[in-house]
Amino acid sequence: TANSEEQVRNIYRPLVATILLGPLKELMRVRDTFIRILQPGREGEADALDLDRIDVVTASAKSRLGNPITDAEQDEAGLYTKSNGMIAVATTQRRGAAGMGGRTHAWTNAWDPGEDSYAQQVFENAEDDVFVFYRNPDLAKSLRHRDGRPLDFNLKSERLKMLEYVYRGSPWVDLNSIESEAKALMKTDPTQAERFFGNRLVQGGGAWLEDGLWESCYAGA
């Protein structure tokens, strides 16, 4: 599941390749917009029975919504908003999975706090039985100055410390390449650079108030 067909292909293409190049090839059939999971002894009847399948779902391809499902993989949930219709898609999938004892999984880069995305709603309203993992660099004591101030993503030396923290446990990531891209993006869209590379929850350029300003006016009230 993703906001656009191009985006959903980010996970659908590797899945198709895994099937066609591995032992699952004999157990599944790849179609144009879905993958059929074959039933033992019923290969010829699989399409007619319309049983187990893996579907592509986007904002413009929602024909299967409402069907009972056992799993939904929701890519870049930080881009799911009310205006693009993807919050309705995600919540419908959760209801469908709940009815079948299934699960949904969502992942994303840091979201824009001003958009009230699906990822933001899940994070802020998470129940005890919902697992949420977010490595927030602003909560790491090692990424603060002695006076408690968070590191400045605009400064290369401090930005590198944040990148090392964010990408810890991902040895395949080239931090030099990430640093180059972050530096370039800082020139045109600094808040996006902080969200995408620094994993920080900062508002986009359209924000009418600075982060924390509204809340600080009511601190201690």
Question: Where would I find each of the regions flagged by the language model?
Answer:
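An acidic- and aromatic-residue-enriched active-site/binding cleft used to recognize and process polar
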Residues: 3-5, 59-61, 77, 82, ...
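Conserved nucleotide-state-sensing and coupling region of NTP-binding domains
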Residues: 1-60, 119-120, 187-188
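Conserved RecA-like ASCE ATPase "motif II neighborhood" in helicase/translocase motors
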Residues: 31-96, 219
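Short, surface-exposed, charge-dense and proline/glycine-enriched linear segments
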Residues: 24-30, 61-73, 131-141
